[in-house]
From Swiss-Prot:
GO terms for molecular function: rRNA binding; structural constituent of ribosome. PROSITE patterns: RIBOSOMAL_L9 (PS00651). It comes from Pisum sativum (Garden pea). This is Large ribosomal subunit protein bL9c. Signal peptide: none annotated. Keywords: Chloroplast, Plastid, Ribonucleoprotein, Ribosomal protein, RNA-binding, rRNA-binding, Transit peptide. Part of the 50S ribosomal subunit. GO terms for cellular component: chloroplast; ribonucleoprotein complex; ribosome. The gene is RPL9. The lineage of its organism: Eukaryota, Viridiplantae, Streptophyta, Embryophyta, Tracheophyta.
Length: 194
């Protein structure tokens, strides 16, 4: 019992001292002065980099990215997969992009000229052994057309770019040559029975 009275007696002065402190803390000495709060937000530290090779879930080679400092310092830089962006590097990157664009334009122009040449050439003649009526033995394949183009025009063409309808009869057909993603040449193919 003595211990319970001791604890009850000792807790009341403590409560009074806390209450007294709370009153003094909540009151401002001068009500006309402003109350200022300073808060600092942690900033994200990033670096601008250029990737030297393709990295899964990060980006492709030559891409300009903002990455965390730790990721660059601990992974990208030691493994040689990225470099920091400097004015000199940006200038080199711009020159390289211009060179690549010029090369793309040159390839597109060559493909357009080649398409015009194929379309104005006329028809490629394919001879096959004939059967009943207009039927032929076998069919004309993309490889046959590639061989004929090589023989008549001395031009190498990959058979994967040739889109040829199924040819099992004599007559005139139109084949497509996909010379560039933006350029397709249409060529006529005359199938003649021997």
């Amino acid at each position: 019992m003595a211990s319970s009275t001791l604890s009850s007696l000792s807790s009341t002065p403590l409560q009074h001292s806390f209450a007294a402190n709370l009153k003094t803390c909540s009151q401002f000495p001068n009500k006309s002065s402003g109350f200022m709060v300073f808060a600092q937000k942690k900033t994200k530290k990033t670096r601008k980099i250029i990737l030297k090779e393709d990295i899964v879930n990060v980006g492709k080679k030559g891409e300009l990215l903002d990455v965390r400092v730790g990721f660059f310092r601990n992974f990208l830089f030691p493994s040689g997969k990225a470099q920091l962006v400097t004015p000199g590097v940006l200038k080199e990157m711009k020159i390289e992009e211009e060179r690549i664009e010029a090369e793309k334009r040159r390839v597109l122009e060559e493909a357009q000229q080649l398409a015009l040449f194929f379309e104005t050439f006329g028809a490629f003649k394919v001879k096959r052994k004939g059967g009943k009526g207009k039927q032929i033995f076998g069919s004309v394949t993309a490889q046959d057309l590639v061989d004929i183009i090589k023989a008549q025009l001395q031009r190498e063409v990959d058979k994967r770019i040739v889109n040829l309808p199924e040819i099992r009869e004599t007559g005139e057909y139109i084949a497509e040559l996909k010379l560039h993603p933006d350029v397709t040449a249409k060529v006529r193919v005359n199938v003649i029975a021997n």
